[in-house]
Regions:
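Walker A (P-loop) phosphate-binding motif
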Residues: 88-129
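Flexible active-site lid/hinge loop adjacent to a nucleotide/diphosphate
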Residues: 140-212, 217-237, 393-399
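Short, basic phosphate-binding NTP loop
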Residues: 1-101, 272-274, 364-374, 383
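Nucleotide phosphate-binding/pyrophosphate-handling subdomain across enzymes
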Residues: 235-334
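Short glycine-rich anion-binding loops that position phosphate/pyrophosphate groups of nucleotides
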Residues: 70-73, 107, 150-152, 171-172, ...
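Residue-level signal for inorganic ion chemistry
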Residues: 19, 66, 102, 147, ...
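Active-site beta-alpha connecting loops in nucleotide-dependent enzymes
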Residues: 3-18, 24-35, 290-356, 360, ...
Length: 419
């Protein structure tokens, strides 16, 4: 019997180093050993004894377990045929250190990185959806801090954390899960699997989770979390939307090692691509929030700049999510939309429905140029790239979208007349 990996991305490629796997991916056109692969220069795994196979070669009768790349949806033909499907978390569930899982719709990367910043001196290592693949994490580390996607949770059968921290949930990845209910079920699944341990959850789930075995701290906002870990909100240097992430990270640290070090956390630097403020030569404020790939992140960004006139770049791959909440938020703001991406026309139609001014730009460089033409040189305006959509319809990643945004700002015709 063989072990099977579905897909050849970062997660499965790291696992494959252990050897003895059958790896199924559409890249592979024929049965071959790595040594004879036409892609030998790209897939150098012959020394591990793996076989690279086309998905049509998969026979569940010859496979004792299957681990999918997280991006493989439940309807994928390989997933449908699999009989012993587990997640990477299950495969490495024998890790004896403390496991911290952090999930939610928006803010989980920042919360995970903040938690790692607080716990690194205690021997913690960060990985999974951000940082190091689980297969490459140090098995002798005292703590694993795992940014945990709904995809991985969906496929997890037995692994559980000692601490599970859930940020608020709003619709996302609906094309993968099929519905918001299934997406929400995945995020809540660890609570029902935990036989002990500590967890944090939004207060709206209190009744639904009342019979869970874990000790769950419910919160409605930053004030609730500050009370849980015994810190003074006024001493924390982060503003919305990062304040919630910061206090949750402090709560996790308090439960994990007994210390919530606000002074240390205040030295943490927010990563690029999240509400990254840029001033052009004229002093105009541009904000790179390209990592806002869902409606909740964009709404948080809009709250941040409430009171300003906002030039909002919106659009991309909406993953089947209804963007109406963003438009409802914009109805009460002084804002104009510059629509880009594959859903440009959909955004334009919704703008008409909600009575919001919109320009169909389709491409990011066009949007930047249009904004520059309309951008007054005063302190009450902001140009905000917060797309509420994924980037893969036009870019390799959200990071590339952000890099291009900054590139287009830099190359604007600075000799143009300003209003």
């Amino acid at each position: 019997m063989r072990k099977s990996l579905f897909g050849y991305g970062g997660t499965t490629r790291a696992i494959a180093k252990s050897g003895g796997w059958d790896i199924y991916d559409d890249k592979f056109d024929e049965i071959c050993s790595d040594e004879n692969s036409k892609n030998n220069e790209k897939f150098r795994t012959d020394e591990f004894g793996n076989r690279l196979l086309n998905p049509r070669e998969f026979n569940p009768q010859n496979s004792e377990l299957e681990i999918p790349s997280p991006g493989f949806p439940p309807r994928h033909k390989l997933v449908q045929k699999a009989q012993n499907l587990i997640s990477e978390y299950d495969y490495f569930s024998d890790f004896t250190g403390q496991k911290i899982w952090i999930s939610g719709t928006n803010g989980k990367t920042t919360t995970t990185k903040m938690t790692q910043f607080l716990l690194e001196k205690f021997g913690a290592q960060m990985g999974a959806n951000v940082g190091i693949p689980v297969a490459n994490l140090d098995k002798s580390a005292s703590i694993w801090i795992l940014e945990t996607s709904s995809f991985t949770i969906h496929y997890t059968k037995c692994a559980t954390p000692e601490i599970y921290a859930l940020l608020p949930i709003t619709p996302d990845h609906l094309s993968w899960h099929g519905s918001f209910q299934e997406y929400e079920n995945a995020k809540l699944k660890p609570f029902f699997m935990m036989k002990n341990g500590i967890a944090f959850a939004p207060k709206c789930y209190e009744n639904r989770l009342k019979d869970c075995a874990a000790k769950i701290y419910f919160y409605e906002n930053e004030i609730d979390l500050a009370k849980i870990c015994g810190v003074n909100l006024g001493e924390i240097s982060f503003k919305t939307p990062f304040l919630l992430d910061a206090v949750l990270a402090l709560c996790i640290a308090k439960m994990a090692v007994g210390v919530a070090d606000v002074e240390l956390l205040n030295r943490f630097v927010i990563e690029a691509n999240k509400l990254e403020e840029i001033r052009d030569k004229f002093g105009r404020l541009w904000v790179n929030d390209t990592k806002a790939t869902n409606i909740d992140a964009t709404i948080c960004a809009l709250r941040r700049y409430k009171g300003h006139k906002i030039h909002l770049i919106l659009g991309g791959d909406d993953k089947g999510v209804d963007l109406s909440p963003v438009f409802e938020k914009l109805q009460n703001m002084d804002a104009k939309i510059y629509a880009i991406g594959i859903n440009t026309q959909k955004i334009a139609d919704m703008s008409v429905k909600f009575g919001i001014n919109c320009e169909k730009c389709e491409f990011l460089d066009v949007a930047v140029e249009k904004i520059s033409q309309n951008f007054h040189t005063n302190l009450d305006e902001v140009a905000l790239l917060s797309p509420a959509c994924a980037s893969l319809d036009q870019f390799k990643s959200y990071a590339q979208r952000g890099d291009k945004f900054k590139e287009y700002i830099a190359r604007l015709n600075l000799n143009c007349d300003l209003n």
